[in-house]
Amino acid sequence: MHQVISATTNPAKIQAILQAFEEIFGEGSCHITPVAVESGVPEQPFGSEETRAGARNRVDNARRLHPQADFWVAIEAGIDDDATFSWVVIDNGVQRGEARSATLPLPAVILDRVRQGEALGPVMSHYTGIDEIGRKEGAIGVFTAGKLTRSSVYYQAVILALSPFHNAVYR
């Protein structure tokens, strides 16, 4: 059984990690341990580079806390131009897989507040009345009318980031 350290305690992200690992390695093939670690970037990262750095930092910090694990996984959400997206970073001590998620364009009413220094999650909670929306369906769930959720979009990015770990051509 793979010991997987999730560099987040966010249920939406943990669900995506678990589903993706079970899709690739088989049901019941892994045990997820969530840990809260620092990203080293602002609460609301801006741009692909800063967001990716946050995910990389979380993986490195999780690995320092739990060096005995088989995998360390981080999902860092950010804002790039007028959209939200995330970077997924997965490490197994030998190689690293990284993938960027799909992007969701955000309306100006939301972006204006985020650009003024507020994090997307609290802005969306205020807008929707849903407490801790970032730990649930997220802006993705709201603006796609539930057709996608934060977790479902992250799931795809985790699957992509896992590609180097089960395809020999990457080695």
From Swiss-Prot:
For the biological process aspect of GO, one term held by this record is: thiamine metabolic process
Q: What quaternary structure, including any partners, is listed in this protein's UniProt entry?
A: Homodimer.
> What catalytic activity is recorded?
XTP + H2O = XDP + phosphate + H(+); ITP + H2O = IDP + phosphate + H(+)
Keyword hit for Manganese:
yes
Its keywords, alphabetically, are:
Hydrolase, Magnesium, Manganese, Metal-binding, Nucleotide metabolism, Nucleotide-binding
Record's family?
A: Belongs to the YjjX NTPase family.
Summary of the function given for this chain in its UniProt record: Phosphatase that hydrolyzes non-canonical purine nucleotides such as XTP and ITP to their respective diphosphate derivatives. Probably excludes non-canonical purines from DNA/RNA precursor pool, thus preventing their incorporation into DNA/RNA and avoiding chromosomal lesions.
Natural source organism? Salmonella agona (strain SL483)
> Which residues of this UniProt protein bind Mg(2+)?
38, 68
Q: Please share the entry's free-text remark on the cofactor.
A: Binds 1 divalent metal cation per subunit; can use either Mg(2+) or Mn(2+).
| Name of this chain's protein | Inosine/xanthosine triphosphatase
Q: Which residues bind substrate?
A: 8-13
Q: Which co-factor is required? A: Mg(2+); Mn(2+)
